[in-house]
UniProtKB/Swiss-Prot annotation:
This is UPF0210 protein STER_0157. CDD domains: RNR_PFL_like_DUF711. Transmembrane segments: none annotated. HAMAP family: UPF0210. It comes from the Bacteria. It comes from Streptococcus thermophilus (strain ATCC BAA-491 / LMD-9). Belongs to the UPF0210 family.
C-alpha cells in the first residue's frame, strides 16, 4: 500500500465520516424451540448471550486496532413467529422481553428478528406475532420487528398488508417511537445486517457475522472532484470509491468472524447515511449536478449511484449480500430532511426513487390521523414495486402529529418533518384482502 492510499484512508475516516455502520451477528434459534413459552424464551436468552457475549468487545478491539469507527454491534435472530409456533401462547411479548434482556446483557445497540414471513399466507405463529408487535415494541428498548408480506415468487399477501396498516397505527399509539423499529418488506433478505429489518434466515448457518459499511461522505467528496465530467467518468469515480469502502468492510468482517470463532457471512454494500452534515446520500446526488434532491433527474442520479456502488463492491468482496444499495431514509439523512422542509421532495417522488434504491419509504413521518387503510395502501404500492422489479422494497413510516410538525427521534435516527399524505381514500381497495398473484416473469423453472 503506497503513502497516497494511506492518506486517502485517513481522510475518509477523519474528514468524510467513513465508518463501519454495523457488525451484526446472525444467530439461529431453531434449537430453542419448546412447547412451553417460558422455557423457550429462556433458551433464546441463553443462546444469544452465550454466542454474542464477546461481540461488543471484539468490535471495539478491531475499531481501535484499525482506527476505523464501528458504530453499532447488533444481533439478528430466526423469525420469532417460527419459534413461537410450537407453543400454545396467544401472545409473544415474552419472547420480545427475552430478546431485550439479552441485548442489554451483551451491550448491543439493537436486536432484530421479532419477525414473520407471510408472503403467501398465515401459519399458526404469524398472526400471534403480528398482533404482539405494538406491545413488544412499546415494552422493550432494543427489539426490532419486521414482516415480509410479498415476494416476486408468491405475489403480495393483501390480507397481511391490511393488517400491517392497522399494526403500524397501534404501534404508534402504544409508543410514538415504536414504528421506527418496524419494517414491512417485500422480498426480504435473510442476511441483512441493518436494522430494523434484520432477521436470521432459516437457510443460514447457525451463527454468522454480517457487516454493513457506510460512506456517503466519501462518495460525495469523490464526486465533487469531477465537476462537469461525463457520466462515464462519474460512474468510474463512484465505482472506485465503493471498492475502497467495501474492502474495509470485508477486512472488518473477516477479523470479527475469526476472533469470535463463527462464519463470515456477507458485506452489505448499502450506503447508509446519518443526520450528520457530510454523511448524506442526498448530498451525493446533488454533487452530481442536481440543485436539490427531488428535482427532475434525481431518480437517474440515484440509479447511477446504486449500480456503481454494487459494481465496485462486488469486486472488493467475495461475499456480498443484504440489501446492497443506497438508503434514502428521510429522518436519517440531513440532505433529505432539508429537501422535505423546502418542499422539493414529496412522498410520490420518494416512491419513484424506491424503484431504484436499496429499501423504500424509510423513516418517514406522516400525520397521526392518516387512516390505517391509507398506510396499508402505501405498503401495497411499495410491495408492488419490489415484486414486479424483483428487488427488496420496504416501508418504515411513523404516524405522528400533523403535517409540518417535526418528529425528534434522536441519535442515528435523526428527525423527520411530518409529510403531506394524499387524502383520497383507498379503504375499499384494501378491504378486499386475499392475494395479488405473482407476476408472470416470476416463473423461472
Amino acid at each position: 500500500m503506497d503513502i497516497k492510499q494511506v492518506t486517502e484512508t485517513i481522510a475518509m475516516i477523519e474528514e468524510q465520516n467513513f465508518d463501519v455502520r454495523t457488525i451484526t451477528m446472525g444467530i439461529s434459534l431453531l434449537d430453542c424451540i419448546d412447547s412451553d413459552i417460558d422455557k423457550a424464551a429462556e433458551k433464546v436468552y441463553n443462546k444469544i448471550v452465550s454466542k454474542a457475549k464477546n461481540l461488543v468487545a471484539v468490535g471495539d478491539e478491531i475499531a481501535a486496532e484499525l482506527g476505523i469507527p464501528i458504530v453499532n454491534k447488533r444481533v439478528s435472530v430466526t423469525p420469532i413467529s417460527i419459534i413461537g409456533a410450537a407453543t400454545d401462547a396467544t401472545d409473544y411479548v415474552p419472547f420480545a422481553r427475552a430478546l431485550d434482556r439479552a441485548a442489554k446483557e451483551i451491550g448491543i445497540n439493537f436486536i432484530g428478528g421479532f419477525s414473520a414471513l407471510v408472503q403467501k399466507g398465515y401459519q399458526k405463529g404469524d398472526e400471534i406475532l403480528i398482533d404482539s408487535i405494538p406491545r413488544a415494541l412499546a415494552e422493550t428498548d432494543f427489539v426490532c420487528s419486521s414482516v415480509n408480506i410479498g415476494s416476486t415468487k408468491t405475489g403480495i399477501n393483501m390480507t397481511a398488508v391490511r393488517d400491517m396498516g392497522r399494526i403500524i397505527k397501534e404501534a404508534s399509539e402504544a409508543d410514538p417511537m415504536g414504528p421506527g423499529k418496524l419494517v414491512v418488506f417485500a422480498n426480504a433478505v435473510e442476511d441483512n445486517p441493518f436494522m430494523a429489518g434484520a432477521f436470521h434466515g432459516v437457510g443460514e448457518a447457525d451463527v454468522v457475522i454480517n457487516v454493513g459499511v457506510s460512506g456517503p461522505g466519501v462518495v460525495q467528496r469523490a464526486v465533487e472532484k469531477v465537476p462537469g465530467e461525463s457520466f462515464d467518468v462519474l460512474a468510474e469515480t463512484v465505482k472506485k470509491t465503493a471498492f475502497k469502502i467495501t474492502r474495509v468492510g470485508q477486512l472488518v468482517g473477516q477479523m470479527a468472524s475469526e476472533r469470535l470463532g463463527v462464519e463470515f457471512g456477507i458485506v452489505d454494500l448499502s450506503l447508509a447515511p446519518t443526520p450528520a452534515v457530510g454523511d448524506s446520500v442526498a448530498r451525493v446526488l446533488e454533487a452530481m449536478g442536481l440543485e436539490v434532491v427531488g428535482t427532475h433527474g434525481t431518480t437517474a442520479a440515484l440509479a447511477l449511484l446504486n449500480d456503481q456502488v454494487k459494481k465496485g463492491g462486488i469486486m472488493a468482496c467475495n461475499q456480498v449480500g443484504g440489501l446492497s444499495g443506497a438508503f434514502i431514509p428521510v429522518s436519517e439523512d440531513e440532505g433529505m430532511i432539508a429537501a422535505v422542509q423546502s418542499g422539493h421532495i414529496n412522498l410520490e417522488k420518494l416512491e419513484a426513487m424506491t424503484a431504484i434504491c436499496s429499501v423504500g419509504l424509510d423513516m418517514i413521518a406522516i400525520p397521526a390521523d392518516t387512516p390505517d387503510t391509507t398506510i396499508a395502501a402505501m405498503i401495497a404500492d411499495e410491495a408492488a414495486i419490489g415484486v414486479i422489479n424483483q428487488k427488496t422494497t420496504a416501508v418504515r413510516i411513523i404516524p405522528y402529529g400533523k403535517e409540518g410538525d417535526m418528529l425528534e427521534l434522536g441519535g442515528l435516527l435523526g428527525y423527520a418533518p411530518v409529510m403531506k399524505v394524499n387524502k383520497a381514500s383507498s379503504a375499499d381497495f384494501i378491504a378486499r384482502g386475499g392475494q395479488i398473484p405473482a407476476p408472470v416473469h416470476s416463473f423461472k423453472n
